[in-house]
């Protein structure tokens, strides 16, 4: 039995190898997920959220992950998503403007893709929240 898990995040633009950690906490379509060492193998969909992980020194870390898929296999956690950003890489003004645009689109529901606007809102809120941590 292993004491750690390995986390890697894949996006179309970059791969982020976090490496060996103690725990990952993220949000699936049905709620929060906590992945610990020796977790059962699984695949699930993810919502845009702040993914948290605890490194080997016990430090809590945060990273934004957009909608995507999480795969757990043999103590390796793979997140495959549209975008992922560390807090220091997030442009807060851009996120706030995206939030305003998404809220405006949802208020004026004529001729819009509601699901797309909701996802844009979720992404912008998660980016704003991670900057506030």
UniProtKB/Swiss-Prot annotation:
One Gene Ontology term, aspect cellular component: plasma membrane
Bilayer topology annotation: Peripheral membrane protein
Keywords: ATP synthesis, Cell membrane, CF(1), Hydrogen ion transport, Ion transport, Membrane, Transport
GO molecular function: ATP binding; proton-transporting ATP synthase activity, rotational mechanism
Purpose of the protein: Produces ATP from ADP in the presence of a proton gradient across the membrane.
PANTHER family: ATP SYNTHASE DELTA/EPSILON CHAIN, ATP SYNTHASE EPSILON CHAIN, CHLOROPLASTIC
The name this protein goes by in its record: ATP synthase epsilon chain
Organism: Clostridium botulinum (strain Okra / Type B1)
């Amino acid at each position: 039995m292993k004491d750690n898990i390995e986390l890697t995040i894949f996006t179309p633009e970059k791969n982020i190898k976090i490496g060996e950690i103690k725990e990952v906490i993220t949000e699936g379509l049905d709620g929060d997920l906590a992945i610990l060492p020796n977790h059962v193998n699984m695949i699930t969909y993810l919502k845009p959220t702040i993914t948290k992980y605890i490194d080997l020194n016990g430090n809590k870390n945060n990273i934004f992950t957009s909608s995507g898929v999480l795969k757990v296999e043999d103590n390796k956690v793979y997140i495959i998503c549209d975008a992922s950003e560390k807090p220091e890489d997030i442009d807060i003004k851009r996120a706030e403007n995206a939030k305003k645009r998404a809220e405006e689109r949802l208020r004026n529901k004529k001729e819009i893709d509601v699901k797309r606007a909701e996802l844009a809102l979720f992404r912008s809120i998660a980016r704003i929240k991670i900057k506030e941590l």
